[in-house]
């Protein structure tokens, strides 16, 4: 799923994934009726970390997405953009959308620069914190259109998003292939204009179920 929809870019230098900052979900969504979003980050290591956060607007959250200019300088704001996070501590990062209230879905990459700190130059007069290991983590923020139009088409186990906002789609029930067991489940993010066929769940079976979320609203499809 991550290959096709809202991938995570995670580039490490000097530390392993287990030691990296925990930034929560790979993909975050700001629904059309909200202009703010909070994201909790956590430092589960035994050393303090210096965190710097940068925002980039993307043409698409898929692998071929390019960094593009924002419509206005204050289109998307966050606070705090830089912080020292003590060992075993957490912090809430808040995002504020102030861009156009139109029918366009917008995609942003949140770039987290994470540096572990150690004490150096210890003496009676001073102490200074020096970065000893670093990581660059990328997550995706999807801002739904302020004027969202949710529409879809379903036929023969395939869903098409004919609206202008990303849907979260779900299928569950008997497995299509016996090798996969008795019960299977699939869930994906489906961008506007995209189609997705369920390949693990037997949606033609009477017990096969298909559903989706339009923002926070759950919609049974089959």
Curated annotation (Swiss-Prot):
InterPro entries: EcpB_C (IPR040695), Ig-like_fold (IPR013783), PapD-like_sf (IPR008962). It comes from the Bacteria. Keywords: Chaperone, Fimbrium biogenesis, Signal. Residues 1-20 form the signal peptide. Gene3D superfamilies: Immunoglobulins. Induction: Negatively regulated by H-NS. Positively regulated by IHF and EcpR. The keyword Transmembrane does not apply. Part of the ecpRABCDE operon, which encodes the E.coli common pilus (ECP). ECP is found in both commensal and pathogenic strains and plays a dual role in early-stage biofilm development and host cell recognition. Belongs to the EcpB/EcpE family. This is Probable fimbrial chaperone EcpB. The gene is ecpB.
């Amino acid at each position: 799923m991550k290959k096709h929809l809202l991938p995570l870019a995670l580039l490490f230098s000097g530390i392993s994934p287990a030691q990296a900052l925990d930034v929560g979900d790979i993909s975050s969504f700001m629904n059309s009726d909200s202009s703010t979003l909070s994201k909790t980050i956590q430092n589960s290591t035994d050393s303090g970390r210096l965190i710097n956060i940068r925002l980039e607007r993307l043409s698409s959250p898929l692998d071929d997405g390019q960094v593009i200019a924002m419509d206005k300088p204050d289109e998307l704001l966050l606070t705090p953009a830089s912080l020292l996070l003590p060992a075993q501590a957490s912090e809430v990062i808040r995002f504020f959308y102030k861009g156009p209230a139109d029918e366009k879905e917008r995609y942003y990459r949140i770039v987290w620069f994470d540096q572990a700190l150690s004490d150096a130059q210890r003496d009676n007069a001073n102490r200074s914190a020096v970065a000893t290991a670093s990581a660059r983590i990328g997550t995706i923020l999807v801002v739904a259109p302020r004027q969202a139009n949710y529409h879809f088409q379903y036929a023969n186990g395939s869903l098409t998003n004919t609206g202008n906002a990303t849907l979260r789609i779900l299928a569950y029930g008997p497995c299509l292939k016996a090798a996969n067991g008795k019960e299977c489940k699939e869930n994906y993010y489906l961008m506007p204009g995209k189609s997705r066929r369920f390949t693990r769940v037997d949606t033609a079976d009477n017990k096969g179920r298909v559903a989706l979320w339009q923002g926070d609203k759950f919609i049974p499809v089959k």
